[in-house]
Design a protein with these regions (language model features):
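Surface-exposed alpha-helical segments enriched in charged/polar residues
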Residues: 49-50, 111
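Acyl-donor (CoA/ACP) binding surface of acyl/acetyltransferases
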Residues: 1-27, 60, 64-184
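Conserved GNAT-fold acetyl-CoA-binding loop/helix
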Residues: 28-49
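Short loop/turn motifs at secondary-structure junctions and domain boundaries
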Residues: 51-56, 142
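Juxtamembrane/interface motifs at transmembrane-helix termini
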Residues: 39-43, 51-53, 92-93, 180-181
Length: 184
């Protein structure tokens, strides 16, 4: 369990499965920047029973607020090289956007991935108009690397993707600055 001031990031529990399935398969809440594809409830239950959404290739966490409500999910998965992971996230209620939950959850996951594993590079990919995700990337220390032209299919259209990365030395340097600040 990864606890922060604003939210907690944790593995899914048996008691979360039905709520998670309902929330994750609610298409209207997905907005313009999350895939409109969804998975059958029975396949999701089967995957949870078999793996709890944790494998060498991917790991899914739920995000809960201070009142222990499931408000989103965040995951990491294999990217192009063994030293690289990509991070994805989603709020279940668009009304919660802009309150810092995803930035906080992403920060917790970054610390976990660099602290517990030998990954050297983390990536975020987003649709170019997704200003909220771009803010998350920048607040978490990611660097814009470029645009992948016509890189993915999203909600009926081929779209570009903006690629951001965070390297382990950049993360370590930022942590050193924060931990060496004088107390007020």
């Amino acid at each position: 369990m990864l606890r922060g001031r604003l939210c907690t990031v944790r593995h899914m529990l048996n008691t979360d499965v039905n709520a998670y399935i309902a929330l994750t398969n609610d298409l209207p809440s997905r907005g313009d920047y999350y895939s409109s594809q969804f998975t059958s409830p029975e396949l999701l239950r089967k995957e949870f029973i078999q793996t709890a959404f944790v494998s060498e290739d991917k790991e899914l966490f739920v995000i809960e607020d201070a009142a222990h409500n499931l408000i989103g999910s965040i995951h990491h998965f294999k990217s192009r090289t063994p030293l690289c992971r990509e991070i994805g996230y989603r709020l279940f209620d668009p009304a919660l956007a802009g309150r810092g939950y995803i930035t906080a959850a992403t920060g917790l996951l970054i610390d976990y991935l660099f602290g517990a594993y030998q990954y050297h590079r983390l990536e975020l990919m987003m649709e170019p108009n997704n200003v909220g995700s771009e803010r998350v990337a920048l607040k978490c220390g990611f660097t814009f690397e470029g645009t992948l032209r016509q890189a993915f299919f999203l909600n009926g259209a081929i779209r570009d993707a903006r690629l951001y990365s965070l390297l382990r030395p950049e993360w370590a340097a930022a942590r050193a600055v924060v931990t060496n600040l004088p107390e007020l």
